[in-house]
């Protein structure tokens, strides 16, 4: 049946650019990729895009901690994210960043239209301010008790327990996440998006079929509570886009983050030249727009985002496809247990198709959480992919290759059975289309059981030993391989790597529309192992490596220790040879002919030493050091220098130049005391 090709734009939520992709993230990207691959197999024009969410205070602060520019940090993180997604065969057409000129331009455009249309309000507000860090605190940098359900340790914008949204000033007993200080209130002028003006439109959109019923019901609770104007402003210092004509004020990350979908697509249009941005984003667009997101960001995508689009003259999403969280072994992902598994760590140990299959087998169109039970994961992948599907090919391919030079029979051994398999296409297609991949997998595996039962009943290994039955053997094995081909066609959206190897073996593309025509009198390639069983030891090694990731992460430092790592270990006897003493600086003077050295005269409590020290740049007025106690190495061999003999070494910290700091003992220490 010929169908009219649809124009479809698909997005996944933008990963935040301050951390690695983990298996929780991968659920969404795998779910979306399976749906996209299915749509492409059916001939639809699909553009699949994503980007890094690269703005906000967390990125600014983390870059500061690392001692690098935010731009450098997000560039490195983008490269890592794209490598992980490629490793899982996520078939993005474009992966961009919200920190882009396209996004800056579109954010300014949308803000300008909203302002022009009267949907931007400005007023002076009192906001929490960190007196220790000298900065206003964004909502995600304040934690306290939820004002609605009284759950502790909640962020300043929304409660992860009850889902309520509120302002940071409503938190009970707030604390700065940055310094731990109790914030104080200060006034600042902010810009607000008039969300309540869109209440009627949003309620109609909510019940238009654009949302899952669970999401629509949750939104009704928010409508019943009353919508509030949305603060879209953040004060400097902030890493993001400065608001036009408002120096020192920046767009809140959640304003420009969803606009990043548009920015990434605009970037794709500019690169390709044959795509028209307006065809997908103008108000009367006939293209479909789908956002795959997690349930934790429903509020932003179901209220703010469609209202922003409506108020600025753009189209709204066709659907939001919302999924639940990932647990591992029945519990929240845990770094200490090794179940907080990064995508990169997984790929070092296991085939991406394994996780894609397991997620697909559990996913539905509902918002239920998915549990990655690692033992069940091993058993299901081995039982289904290896024992049922791939084994079907290996049981038959050997006879075809050895006895018939890789040539399949010219007729089907059981046309009625084959039709049973191809007739299932409609039901499986409907399951994929409605994001019921778990149901699709169940139907495919039921067919796999039938196919293996056919081979068991026909027993080609017995037929192969009987004289004069070569034609029967070829027909039976060809039937088995044709059934394998149908199964792998159905599984192609889920298992792209295995599908590619299968296509090489079958010497044909796995095409949904081609399954009604069996492979007859067709040449296949010599059979090679298509898929390896999962060994539980590999899974355990991955878990152990994830624990090591946590230890490594905890040990990663920036600043002095990173710049000058701890040197090789010495034993106590070596350390005991160094005699450090408290010394009084009796005199400190410049050294003629040297721009680095000071001449120090030190009193060790009965003995005077002369020491030359390279601290002149840090202490340009050496007289200020006189009368100060310090620490010196007293048994260092005298060193003859151009300016005289140096009889020891004073202890100082820092990289050098102006950044060097002479060590001083605590009060009570006296010249001559040994430092132990």
Swiss-Prot record:
Family annotation (Pfam families): Anticodon_3 (PF19303), tRNA-synt_1g (PF09334), tRNA_bind (PF01588)
Organism: Pectobacterium carotovorum subsp. carotovorum (strain PC1)
Motif ('HIGH' region): 15-25
Domain of life: Bacteria
Cofactor(s), by name: Zn(2+)
Keywords: Aminoacyl-tRNA synthetase, ATP-binding, Cytoplasm, Ligase, Metal-binding, Nucleotide-binding, Protein biosynthesis, RNA-binding, tRNA-binding, Zinc
Subcellular location: Cytoplasm
Protein name: Methionine--tRNA ligase
Binding site for Zn(2+): 146, 149, 159, 162
GO cellular component: cytosol
CDD domains: Anticodon_Ia_Met, MetRS_core, tRNA_bind_EcMetRS_like
Motif ('KMSKS' region): 332-336
Subunit structure: Homodimer.
């Amino acid at each position: 049946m010929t169908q009219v090709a649809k124009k479809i734009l698909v997005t996944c939520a933008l990963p935040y650019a301050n951390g690695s992709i983990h298996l929780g993230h991968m659920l969404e990207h795998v779910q979306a990729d399976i749906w996209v691959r299915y749509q492409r197999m059916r001939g639809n024009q699909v553009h699949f895009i994503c980007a890094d969410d690269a703005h906000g205070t967390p990125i600014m602060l983390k870059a500061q901690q690392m001692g690098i520019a935010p731009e450098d940090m997000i560039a490195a993180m983008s490269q890592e994210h794209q490598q992980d997604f490629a490793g899982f065969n996520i078939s993005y057409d474009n992966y961009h960043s919200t920190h882009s000129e396209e996004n800056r331009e579109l954010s300014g455009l949308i803000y300008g239209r909203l302002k022009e249309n009267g949907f931007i309000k400005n007023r002076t507000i009192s906001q929490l301010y960190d007196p220790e860090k000298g900065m206003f605190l964004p909502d995600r940098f304040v934690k306290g008790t939820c004002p609605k359900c009284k759950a502790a340790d909640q962020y300043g914008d929304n409660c992860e327990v009850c889902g309520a949204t509120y302002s940071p000033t409503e938190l009970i007993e707030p604390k700065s996440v940055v310094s731990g200080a109790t914030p104080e209130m200060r006034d600042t002028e902010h810009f607000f998006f008039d969300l309540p003006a869109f209440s009627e439109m949003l309620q109609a959109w909510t019940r238009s079929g654009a949302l899952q019923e669970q999401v629509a019901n949750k939104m009704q609770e928010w409508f019943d509570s009353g919508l509030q104007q949305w603060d879209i402003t953040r004060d400097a210092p902030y890493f993001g886009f400065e608001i036009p004509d408002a120096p020192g004020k920046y767009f809140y990350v959640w304003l420009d983050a969803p606009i990043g979908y548009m920015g990434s697509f605009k970037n794709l249009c500019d690169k390709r030249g044959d795509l028209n941005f307006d065809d997908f984003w103008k108000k009367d667009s006939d293209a479909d727009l789908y956002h795959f997101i997690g349930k934790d960001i429903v509020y932003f995508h179901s209220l703010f985002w469609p209202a922003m689009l409506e108020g600025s003259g753009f189209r709204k999403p066709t659907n939001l496809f919302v999924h639940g969280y990932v647990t591992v072994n029945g519990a929240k992902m845990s770094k200490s247990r090794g179940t907080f598994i990064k995508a990169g760590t997984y790929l070092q140990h296991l085939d991406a198709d394994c996780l894609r299959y397991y997620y697909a087998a559990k996913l539905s169109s509902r918002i239920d959480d998915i549990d990655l039970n690692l033992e069940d994961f091993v058993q299901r992948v081995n039982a289904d992919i290896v024992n049922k599907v791939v084994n079907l090919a290996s049981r038959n391919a050997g006879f075809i290759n050895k006895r018939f030079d890789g040539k399949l029979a010219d007729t089907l051994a059981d046309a009625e059975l084959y039709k049973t398999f191809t007739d299932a296409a409609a039901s499986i297609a409907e399951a994929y289309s409605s994001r019921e991949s778990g149901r699709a997998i169940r139907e495919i595996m039921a067919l796999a059981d039938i196919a293996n039962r056919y081979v068991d009943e026909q027993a080609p290994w017995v037929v192969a030993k009987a004289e004069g039955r070569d034609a029967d053997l070829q027909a039976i094995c060809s039937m088995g391989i044709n059934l394998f081909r149908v199964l792998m066609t159905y599984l192609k959206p889920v298992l792209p790597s295995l599908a590619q190897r299968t296509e090489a073996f079958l010497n044909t593309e796995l095409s949904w529309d081609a399954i009604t025509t069996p492979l007859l009198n067709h040449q296949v390639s010599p059979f090679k192992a298509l898929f390896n069983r999962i060994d539980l030891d590999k899974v355990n090694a991955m878990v152990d490596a994830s624990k090591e990731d946590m230890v490594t992460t905890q040990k990663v430092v920036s600043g002095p220790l990173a710049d000058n790592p701890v040197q090789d270990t010495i034993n106590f006897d070596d350390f005991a040879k160094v005699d450090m003493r408290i010394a009084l600086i009796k005199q400190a003077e410049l050294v003629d002919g040297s721009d680095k050295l000071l001449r120090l005269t030190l009193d060790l409590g009965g003995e005077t030493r002369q020491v030359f020290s390279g601290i002149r740049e840090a202490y340009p007025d050496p007289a200020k050091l006189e009368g100060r106690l310090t620490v010196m190495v007293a048994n260092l061999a005298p060193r003859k220098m151009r300016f005289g003999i140096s009889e020891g070494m004073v202890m100082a910290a820092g990289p050098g130049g102006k950044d060097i700091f002479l060590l001083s003992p605590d009060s009570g220490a006296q010249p001559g005391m040994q430092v132990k």
